[in-house]
Design a protein with these regions (language model features):
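Periplasmic-binding protein-like
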Residues: 40-42, 117-121, 195-231, 253-256
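Acidic, polar ligand-binding/catalytic clefts
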Residues: 63, 75-136, 147-148, 204-209
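Extended ligand-binding regions for polar small-molecule ligands
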Residues: 59-68, 128, 135, 140-141, ...
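Bacterial N-terminal signal peptides
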Residues: 11-20
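Extracytoplasmic small-molecule ligand-binding "clamshell" domains
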Residues: 25-102, 106, 144
Length: 256
């Protein structure tokens, strides 16, 4: 599921080199434009890939970046954990929205913290599973997204009972069926997932502040050299107010 001026341009020398490497015209026109492969999973409202739609906060932002840099974008839809593997192998160029971790930095470069932070919420159905403090998590079965990172203490806590699923929608269905007692998710992703599968949930009073998430580039990708240009365009989008408008748009959609 998809947060300066407009005079952002590629350095001439890089543009000429890229034309040879990618078969693109030096002026960055549509003829022979480079194609950037982006690994994505369906996770509204950030990345929406459903019934032929390709939208969402993260996708809309990256599409704007690609358009300004003269790139074509090809989205490859796979589960979140699979995207991480494809980034390691260099089989996709870009990943949208990972949080920064030391392990991931070995195989992906973090171009820019493009997307706003979101609280980590703890969803539940039965009153006894309400989380008021971190210690309430012990002894409960907790649903988490495969390959996701939430916050350091939680991620490294081997005493917690965690069950995984490839999508937040799956986790909400597991919650409904009693297979897990709590689901942890970024705020908008969790709310959207519960609504999408029509599962009634409650939100615990305990939450954890989120981190900004990133546009990341595989270290094996030829577009790694354009990390600075991506960051410049994202800053332009932010300065122009487009980022804020997109965040507001998708935040409103998520909570309707």
């Amino acid at each position: 599921m998809t947060y300066l001026s407009k005079k952002v341009f590629l350095y001439a020398l890089l543009g000429l080199f890229s034309a040879a490497a990618w078969g693109q015209t030096a002026d960055g026109g549509n003829e022979g434009a480079r194609t950037v492969v982006v690994g994505v999973d369906h996770s509204p409202p950030y990345r929406i890939l459903d019934a032929g739609r390709q939208s969402g906060l993260y996708l809309d932002i990256f599409n704007e970046v690609a358009d300004r840099l003269g790139w074509q974008v090809e989205y490859e839809q796979v589960p979140f954990r699979r995207i991480l593997l494809l980034m390691q192998e260099g089989k996709v160029d870009v990943m949208l929205g990972p949080v920064r971790t030391e392990n991931r930095a070995a195989y992906m470069a973090y171009a820019t913290a493009a997307f706003p932070p979101e609280r980590r919420l703890f969803f539940y159905r039965e009153p006894e599973n309400r989380v008021t403090q971190y210690s309430d998590l012990y002894g409960k079965s907790i649903g988490v997204l495969e390959g996701a990172r939430y916050f350091e203490r939680f991620d490294k806590d081997d005493q917690l009972k965690k069950s995984t699923a490839p999508r937040y929608q799956n986790l909400m269905l597991m919650l409904e069926k009693g297979r897990v007692e709590v689901v942890v998710a970024p705020e908008l992703a969790g709310i959207s997932a519960a609504r999408d599968v029509q599962v009634e949930v409650e939100v615990s009073p305990f939450s954890v502040p989120g981190e900004r998430s990133w546009i990341a580039i595989s270290r094996k990708s030829p577009i790694l050299e354009y990390a600075d240009e991506i960051a410049e365009v994202v800053e332009a989008i932010r300065q122009e107010g487009l980022m804020e408008r997109l965040v507001t748009k998708y935040s409103n959609l998520a909570v309707k």
